[in-house]
Swiss-Prot record:
HAMAP family xrefs: DapB
Gene transcribed to yield this protein: dapB
Binding annotation for (S)-2,3,4,5-tetrahydrodipicolinate: H149, G158, T159
Record EC number: 1.17.1.8
Catalytic activity from the UniProt record: (S)-2,3,4,5-tetrahydrodipicolinate + NAD(+) + H2O = (2S,4S)-4-hydroxy-2,3,4,5-tetrahydrodipicolinate + NADH + H(+); (S)-2,3,4,5-tetrahydrodipicolinate + NADP(+) + H2O = (2S,4S)-4-hydroxy-2,3,4,5-tetrahydrodipicolinate + NADPH + H(+)
Protein name in UniProt: 4-hydroxy-tetrahydrodipicolinate reductase
GO molecular function, one term: NAD binding
InterPro entries to which the protein is assigned, alphabetical: DapB_C (IPR022663), DapB_N (IPR000846), DapB_N_CS (IPR022664), DHDPR_bac (IPR023940), NAD(P)-bd_dom_sf (IPR036291)
UniProt source species: Lawsonia intracellularis (strain PHE/MN1-00)
Length: 258
């Protein structure tokens, strides 16, 4: 089956990058969706465009929807995609627990793929970090620092939270109890069962995540640096190629691919 896609938020940074990479790879772009005020800026693509997903999804029910927008928009798009049978790839972060529950419920009857970071490198890291945490043991304190551009709306990043969740699970900790997002004043000694998660925002940084394992007399630093949004787009398109061969039933992630 030939891959064809529908890009949501096509005038945004990720939307433009997805279109560019898809064109470079010869992938068919059936349509784009954006706000009414932004549709004129998309005319140069010579692709079907609209602000109403029902009109587009019903016209291209086999196309894979790719969405890197906002939690509210992503939920709405997933609901419309379910209606017409479109698979959907979601790279949005910042979901509330209730919103994420909605996604998981929708995934029982429609094909939904979600990842807070579509980078292959980050997901390989997520797969290997638990082993490091277990081997090093609790004597090695875990700290996470993430850096992103000044336009990013959510903090900490979805990727930082996914890293923290992965590491806390590997040590059988409850992340809600051990996460530390801020230290100020006289906070006392650092508890052994704690994961620090710090956020930096500035400039046009695409994304940097550093994980520290700090032990007696030594420190291990692991850094993933995204130099271009193209790697996120490539990951999303890889997911799109994969999901058209899958069945509904659960929420898929990059862990299912790598």
């Amino acid at each position: 089956m030939d891959l064809s896609i529908i890009v949501i938020g096509a005038s945004g940074r990720m939307g433009k990058t997805i279109i560019q990479v898809a064109q470079e790879q010869g992938i068919i772009i059936d349509a784009v969706i954006d706000r009414p005020t932004r549709l004129t800026s998309l005319a140069s693509y010579n692709i079907a465009s609209d602000s109403e997903p029902d009109k587009i999804f019903s016209r291209y029910p086999q196309a894979v929807v790719i969405d890197f927008t906002t939690p509210e928009t992503s939920i709405s798009m997933a609901q419309v995609a379910q209606k017409y049978g479109n698979p959907i790839i979601i790279g949005t972060t910042g979901f509330t627990l209730e919103q994420f529950d909605t996604l998981e419920t929708l995934a029982k009857t429609s094909r939904i793929f979600w990842s807070p970071n579509m980078s292959i490198g980050i997901n390989v890291l997520l797969k290997t970090l638990p082993q490091m945490a277990q081997i090093l043991g609790n004597e090695y304190n875990i700290e996470i620092v993430e850096v992103h551009h000044n336009k990013k709306k959510d903090a900490p990043s979805g990727t930082a939270m996914r890293i923290a969740e992965t590491l806390s699970t590997s040590r059988h900790w409850d992340l809600e109890k051990v996460a530390c997002y801020n230290r100020e004043g006289i906070v006392g000694e650092r508890p052994q069962e704690q994961i620090g998660i710090q956020t930096i925002r500035g400039g046009d940084v695409v994304g940097v995540h550093t994980i520290y394992f700090i032990g007696p007399g030594e420190r291990i630093e692991i850094t993933h640096q995204a130099d271009s949004r193209k790697n996120f787009a490539q990951g999303a398109l890889k997911a799109a190629e994969w999901i058209i061969k899958q069945k509904a039933g659960r929420l898929y992630t990059m862990m299912d691919i790598i």
